[in-house]
């Protein structure tokens, strides 16, 4: 059974929703070099609860299971516990979940957030490119977030965490989660365990060769042997993203 966990407070309290998955953090990774992931954003509702990716000056891409009716988006962040000179805050003006998102299966776990006003790009705030094609199995990717860093217990970091991990084959993904993987999902990580995203990373980016190929979605536990992280396959949604942005 999958369980989905959303952070409720800075202390790491979480609530489980039936249907599926563990909303993901970084376990077994490393502290990212300062401001080396300028497309990473923090979604806030009085506290950090999910990640996201800046895809142009006024739009952020995240996971549909991170939905709230009002979201504050923080850009240019590195240490989420302090106010930084690089930090820019925007309210959401429109929040759009994929119309076929399922909270039970987590299929189509993707969401667009329009910022109330555009942001100016800087060394600390830059968009990430959408995929020009789907990445192949074996491609090395960068996962980032402020999620839990322990597979047992809680430790939410101040500084942005990074993890380098490969895309697994469709067969490996299906065998890890029989009957749960749709064509809109990819597995990224290590079957031997020890390295993974986890609670608090949900909605955040998986970037491969400079393109946003995945969104942190779900998994069983964090960094457990045989259970890699599962991510929304962004290359399947480029048309929907572009059409939705054009409509608003």
Curated annotation (Swiss-Prot):
- Catalytic activity, EC: 3.4.21.4
Q: What are the protein's GO molecular function terms?
A: metal ion binding; serine-type endopeptidase activity
Question: Could you tell me what the cofactor note in this record states?
Answer: Binds 1 Ca(2+) ion per subunit.
Q: Give the UniProt subcellular location, in the record's own words.
A: Secreted, Extracellular space
Similarity comment: Belongs to the peptidase S1 family.
Please list the residues that bind Ca(2+).
77, 79, 82, 87
Query: SUPFAM superfamilies recorded for this chain?
Result: Trypsin-like serine proteases
Q: Can you tell me which residues form the catalytic site?
A: 65 (charge relay system), 109 (charge relay system), 202 (charge relay system)
Cofactor(s) the protein requires to work: Ca(2+)
Expression (tissue specificity)? High levels are seen in the pancreas while lower levels are found in the liver, spleen and thymus.
Q: What keywords tag this UniProt record?
A: Calcium, Digestion, Disulfide bond, Hydrolase, Metal-binding, Protease, Secreted, Serine protease, Signal, Zymogen
Q: Which reaction does it catalyse?
A: Preferential cleavage: Arg-|-Xaa, Lys-|-Xaa
Q: What's the protein called, per UniProt?
A: Trypsin II-P29
Q: Which cysteines are joined by disulfide bonds?
A: 32-162, 50-66, 134-235, 141-208, 173-187, 198-222
Please give an example of a GO cellular component term from this record.
Answer: extracellular space
């Amino acid at each position: 059974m999958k369980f989905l966990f959303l952070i409720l407070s800075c202390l790491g309290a979480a609530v489980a929703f039936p249907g599926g998955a563990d909303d993901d953090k970084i376990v077994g990774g490393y502290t990212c070099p300062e401001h080396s992931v300028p497309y990473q954003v923090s979604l806030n509702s009085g506290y950090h609860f999910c990640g996201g990716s800046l895809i142009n000056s006024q739009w952020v891409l995240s996971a549909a299971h991170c939905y709230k009716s009002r979201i504050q988006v923080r850009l240019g962040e590195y240490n989420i516990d302090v106010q930084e000179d690089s930090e820019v805050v925007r309210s959401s003006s429109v929040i759009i979940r994929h119309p076929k998102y399922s909270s039970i299966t987590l299929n189509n776990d993707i969401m667009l957030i329009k910022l109330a006003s555009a942001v100016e790009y800087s060394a600390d705030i830059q968009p990430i490119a959408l995929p020009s094609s789907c990445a192949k199995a074996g491609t090395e990717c960068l996962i980032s977030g402020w999620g839990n860093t322990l597979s047992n217990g809680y430790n939410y970091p101040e500084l942005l965490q990074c993890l380098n991990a490969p895309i697994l084959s469709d067969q490996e993904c299906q065998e890890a989660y029989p009957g749960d993987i749709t064509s809109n999902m990819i597995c990224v990580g290590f079957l031997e365990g020890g390295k993974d995203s986890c609670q608090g990373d949900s909605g955040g980016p998986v970037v491969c060769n400079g393109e946003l190929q995945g969104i942190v979605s779900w998994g069983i536990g964090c960094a457990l042997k045989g259970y890699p992280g599962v991510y929304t396959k962004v290359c399947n949604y480029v048309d929907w993203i572009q059409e939705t942005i054009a409509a608003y």
